Amino acid sequence: MKYFIIEIQATEDTATVVTPIQSESSIFAAESKYHQTLAAAAISPVPYHSVVLLDSLGRAVKEPECYIHGGSGSEE
């Protein structure tokens, strides 16, 4: 079974989807990579960063983890 880590990084005017594909056969290896990605997201400079671990059928293995970093705070 393959696992995919989907990373969504959003800046003020763009949203980028970064998809490092993890082809480990072990869920433990995929989970390890998932937690490493979460740790990187926690210190990411982008305002919004979401990470989700999916199985090969696109089903979420873990619920999305989101980090919303501080910004100007103004909403219009």
Predicted regions and their residues:
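Short aromatic-glycine-(Arg/Gly/Cys) micro-motifs in beta-strand/loop hairpins
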Residues: M1-T19
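Hydrophobic beta-strand residues in large extracellular and virion-surface proteins
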Residues: I5-I6, Y34, V51-L53
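A short, charged, amphipathic alpha-helix used as a generic interaction element across diverse proteins
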Residues: A15, E24-H49
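Generic structural motif
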Residues: T11, I27, S56-L57
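Solvent-exposed serine/threonine-rich low-complexity stretches and specific carbohydrate-binding patches
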Residues: P20-S25, P64-I68
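Short, mixed-charge low-complexity intrinsically disordered segments
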Residues: A39-E76
